[in-house]
């Protein structure tokens, strides 16, 4: 079980690929490691299924908490449903792998990446992507690889290859680049309003490292004596495609060139052409080869008809520079935007429409206790900004069961979330937890970028002080031989029949998020740079239209949003505020009808719909945490009486005791002879004992309205600026 290990060094970090040692019954397996992070990746192929017209590829990323030396917190103490992070990494593996399998392959393929050990300095996601390529090559699956991925960070003015978690948090860029020898196949990034040129340079920097990892995979194959299985296109029967080209080209071309029609009309006309063609084929003789082929395979006609439609649409774009809706290549669809479309019980709302794509986004403000706790391998323990994306079937005019969010919904929500994160206010100035939900009401391309635009409108309507508004656009690509055409603001059919979906989001200063997926085996750096630069005027045009609806965040919050009051206390006094078993803080919340959150750093956040109640809770906490000195004089009410003395609330929530001997200069037989519960008295702090108990006295202190020595002003509480 020795296996073979190939190592490659990046900026002092070594990546190791071990093959031939683990999972011997999998089609191919590799343990890919960097630092103490180890990911086992397997690729397995089983016989194909009859009658399908797609590649049944499944990519799964599995997290095991033992990788970080932890036991799951669930009742069963076992990992359950994959967390959102695992779903996103599964998509990260799938997106660069899928276009590298031949279009004719119909075998069941499964790639499983299992994180076996996690080093907090080394994220496991990009290792999983590279491992997926290596495992697929070892499995002998037809594949246009090798493919590899790296992460690029930006610290100051320097690019960092495969940065640690801390470097990612500190930096202005988190970019993942995947590529093949032919070019780049996938890009995903979050950025802190970086200029386009900086992002382009980062992608180029990352691709150089990708090429080194590709060479390492080729070396492993060579040393093991394994020859890569290159995809070979099987002979296809051209009978049906040739027939359709003669019978349908003119009719399809006429439909695609009718620019003033709606999507529904165009789809209806194309369906009518296909149905008419099916009837014509059905009327052919039984011995006719076209009828035989269509009768034997129900998918043959729809597949060939779609291929012809794709070919004609692409030709129209390349040769005539016209799209199916008549737009030029760099033209954005008509845009409308509105803020505050829902009643203010919804804290903020925005409606964004671009062409036939319509998204309604809502923003909800919550308290720190509403933060999402993360039970996964990510060092971050909670999320205070959440974006959830919903894609109901009616948005595309279909009927389907309504189920929980799938991978696509989770991925689109994460992209929109990432686009907004860099412009959110600092926690110190705006301590709210914010949840945005984007409801896709109508879909015809680029709903994720529509969600970004809708989010901006909703957040500004909710009064969230964004650093800058964010808009987004989706770019497309048609590549026919050496002819390349980049499309701005692609709609559904252009996404479906095109070669690229490149989403770019950002402010007027720069990019905050981007995501590129390909349907071809690689794209040159120059074309990617052109797409990024072409997206900027589109983004700014969209942003201008959004600003016509709302150009600055609202001055006030919704009357139904909670009011938060934040201040700092000495972290060593947190226990005093909480009290034994939480008794003190529970009493404060019940007395004032507020929610109170205290962080380990000493930041206290009080949430209430009543400002006066929040102020009262703050006074109580300040009283509890204020240092009391011997000799200070306070006025307060008698709260309770015991045989040996009486208790006085000298500050909100803080009591001291007057011993019976300190009630009067004369001897007192019974406490009630001098004071009763509710009496207002003026007391002096006689001493504070070694257990922190405050002992008070009435002796020598003026009473009954006589002027008393004022207490010193309380220590100022540091505001949260």
From Swiss-Prot:
First-listed, main subcellular location of the protein, grouped into a coarse class: cytoplasm
- EC number(s): the record gives 2.7.7.8
As for subcellular location, the record says: Cytoplasm
Provide the S1 motif domain boundaries: 631-699
Where along the chain is composition biased (Pro residues)? 711-721
Q: Which reaction does it catalyse?
A: RNA(n+1) + phosphate = RNA(n) + a ribonucleoside 5'-diphosphate
Q: Supply one GO molecular-function term.
A: RNA binding
| Keywords associated with the record | Cytoplasm, Magnesium, Metal-binding, Nucleotidyltransferase, RNA-binding, Transferase
Q: Name one Pfam family in it.
A: S1
Q: Which GO terms describe its cellular component?
A: cytosol
Give the top-rank taxon of the lineage listed in the UniProt record for this protein.
Bacteria
Q: Which InterPro entries match?
A: ExoRNase_PH_dom1, ExoRNase_PH_dom2, ExoRNase_PH_dom2_sf, KH_dom, KH_dom_type_1, KH_dom_type_1_sf, NA-bd_OB-fold, PNPase
**Leader sequence segment:** none
Q: CDD domains, from UniProt?
A: KH-I_PNPase (cd02393), RNase_PH_PNPase_1 (cd11363), RNase_PH_PNPase_2 (cd11364)
Please give the biological process terms from Gene Ontology that the record holds: mRNA catabolic process; RNA processing
Q: Which annotated residues bind Mg(2+)?
A: 495, 501
Where is the region Disordered?
700-721
Residues annotated as domain KH? 562-621
**What cofactor does this one take?**
Mg(2+)
Q: Per the similarity annotation, which family is this?
A: Belongs to the polyribonucleotide nucleotidyltransferase family.
Give a short account of what the protein does: Involved in mRNA degradation. Catalyzes the phosphorolysis of single-stranded polyribonucleotides processively in the 3'- to 5'-direction.
Q: What is this protein called?
A: Polyribonucleotide nucleotidyltransferase
Q: Which organism is it from?
A: Synechococcus sp. (strain WH7803)
């Amino acid at each position: 079980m020795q296996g073979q290990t190939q190592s490659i060094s990046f900026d002092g970090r070594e990546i190791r690929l071990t093959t031939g040692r683990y999972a011997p019954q999998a089609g191919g397996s590799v343990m890919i490691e960097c630092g103490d992070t180890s990911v086992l990746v397997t690729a397995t192929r089983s016989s194909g299924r009859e009658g399908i017209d797609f590649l049944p590829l499944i990519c799964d990323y599995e997290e095991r908490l033992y990788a970080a030396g932890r036991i799951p917190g669930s009742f069963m103490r076992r990992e359950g449903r994959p967390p959102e992070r695992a779903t996103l990494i599964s998509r990260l593996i799938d997106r660069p792998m899928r276009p590298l399998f031949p279009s004719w392959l119909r075998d069941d393929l499964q790639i499983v990446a299992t994180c076996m050990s996690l080093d907090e300095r080394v994220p496991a996601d990009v290792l999983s992507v590279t491992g997926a390529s290596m495992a697929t090559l070892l499995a002998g699956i037809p594949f246009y690889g090798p493919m590899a991925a790296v992460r690029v960070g930006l610290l100051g003015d320097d690019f960092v290859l495969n940065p640690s978690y801390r470097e990612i948090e500190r930096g202005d860029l988190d970019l993942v680049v995947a590529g093949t020898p032919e070019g780049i196949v996938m890009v995903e990034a979050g950025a802190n309003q970086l200029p386009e040129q900086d992002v382009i340079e980062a992608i180029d920097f990352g691709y150089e490292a990708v090429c080194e990892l590709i060479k390492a995979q080729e070396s492993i194959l060579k040393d093991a004596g394994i020859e890569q299985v290159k995809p070979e296109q099987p002979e296809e029967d051209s009978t049906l495609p040739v027939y359709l080209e003669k019978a349908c080209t003119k009719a399809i071309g006429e439909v695609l060139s009718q620019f003033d029609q709606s999507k529904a009309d165009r789809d209806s006309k194309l369906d009518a052409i296909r149905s008419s063609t099916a009837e014509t084929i059905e009327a052919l003789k039984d011995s006719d080869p076209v009828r035989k082929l269509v009768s034997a395979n129900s998918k043959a006609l729809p597949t060939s008809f779609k291929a012809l439609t794709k070919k004609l649409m692409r030709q129209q774009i390349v040769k005539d520079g016209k799209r199916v809706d008549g737009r030029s290549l760099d033209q954005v669809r008509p845009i409308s935007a509105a803020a505050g479309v829902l009643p203010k019980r919804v804290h903020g709302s925005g409606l964004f429409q671009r062409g036939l794509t319509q998204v309604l986004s809502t923003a909800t403000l919550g308290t720190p206790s509403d933060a999402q706790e993360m039970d996964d391998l990510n060092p971050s323990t909670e999320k205070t900004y959440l974006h959830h994306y919903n894609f109901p079937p009616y948005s595309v005019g279909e009927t389907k069961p309504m189920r929980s969010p799938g991978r696509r919904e989770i991925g689109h929500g994460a992209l929109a979330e990432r686009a907004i994160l860099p412009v959110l206010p600092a926690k110190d100035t705006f301590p709210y937890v914010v949840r945005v939900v984007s409801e896709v009401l109508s879909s015809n391309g680029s709903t994720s970028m529509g969600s970004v635009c809708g989010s901006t409108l909703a957040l500004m309507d909710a009064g969230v002080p964004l650093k800058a508004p964010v808009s987004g656009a989706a770019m497309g690509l048609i590549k026919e031989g050496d002819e390349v055409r980049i499309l701005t603001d692609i709609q559904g059919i252009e996404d479906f029949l095109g070669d690229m979906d490149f989403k770019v989001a950002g402010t007027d200063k720069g990019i905050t998020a981007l995501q590129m997926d390909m349907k071809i085996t690689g794209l040159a750096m120059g074309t990617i740079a052109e797409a990024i630069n072409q997206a900027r005027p589109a983004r700014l045009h969209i942003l201008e239209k959004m600003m016509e609806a709302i150009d600055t965040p609202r001055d006030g919050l919704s009357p139904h949003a909670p009011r938060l009051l934040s201040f700092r206390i000495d972290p060593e006094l947190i226990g005093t505020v909480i009290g034994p078993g939480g008794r003190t803080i529970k009493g404060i919340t019940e007395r004032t009808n507020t929610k109170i959150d205290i962080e380990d750093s000493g930041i206290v956040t009080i949430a209430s719909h009543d400002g006066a109640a929040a102020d009262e809770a703050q006074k109580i906490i300040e009283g509890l945490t204020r240092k009391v000195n011997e000799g200070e004089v306070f006025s307060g009410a008698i709260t309770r009486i015991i045989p040996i003395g009486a208790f006085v609330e000298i500050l909100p929530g803080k009591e001291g005791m007057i011993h019976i001997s300190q009630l009067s200069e004369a001897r007192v037989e019974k406490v009630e002879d001098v004071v009763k519960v509710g009496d207002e008295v003026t007391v002096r702090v006689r001493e504070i004992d070694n257990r922190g108990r405050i002992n008070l006295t009435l002796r020598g202190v003026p009473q009954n309205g006589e002027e008393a020595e004022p207490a010193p002003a309380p220590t100022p509480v540091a505001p949260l600026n």
